[in-house]
């Protein structure tokens, strides 16, 4: 479904992508692949995803079907709100909840904490990603958290990552993980808060 969502995103953004240096050569934007063919690929991927989905319990199937509109409306968000990255996190981390439901056949606080934390993780890293295109996006009129927080990106990104790290700590606590888990958390803590946040150079496309 994620691949199908990416195709739908590229179809929806094809006119915008043509105007952005980094994305102008994407297959659909550059017309190497027609919109019709891309749509066929998306349908095929959806069918494959459905064939996989029907092997799970009914609760998982229902919850997965509920999430489908999210995947197909995400591409529109950048036209209306400065928070498309938040919507991306809500959409593409939904699989965390589905994975839990497929095994436990119920929803508990643990996957919800993890889901919310992962949503902030996506919000952080996709905000960084957005700085590659910020100059083109501002000219075109596309919205993003990269633009909204362009004057103080490090604080916002650090905040997102701190929420994510707190969620990992809480999940470990709720699942009674031993001390090795918390020691292991030092690695993402250093990577996210130092190398991805404090040392971030938003003016450098390569750094983003």
Name what the model sees in each region.
Residues 1, 45-48, 52, 70, ...:
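Hydrophobic residues within membrane-embedded alpha-helical segments of Major Facilitator Superfamily
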Residues 2-8, 70-76, 94-98, 116-131, ...:
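Transmembrane alpha-helical segments that form the membrane-embedded catalytic/substrate-channel core
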Residues 3-11, 15, 19:
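Transmembrane helical bundles of ABC transporters
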Residues 13, 84, 133:
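Residue-level signature of catalytic and energy-coupling elements of molecular machines
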Residues 14-64, 139-182, 186:
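Multi-pass membrane catalytic core of lipid/isoprenoid biosynthesis enzymes
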Residues 26-113, 194-201:
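Intramembrane alpha-helical segments
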Residues 100, 107-160, 164:
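Aromatic-anchored, glycine/proline-accented short structural segments
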Residues 172-177, 198-208:
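Alpha-helical transmembrane segments
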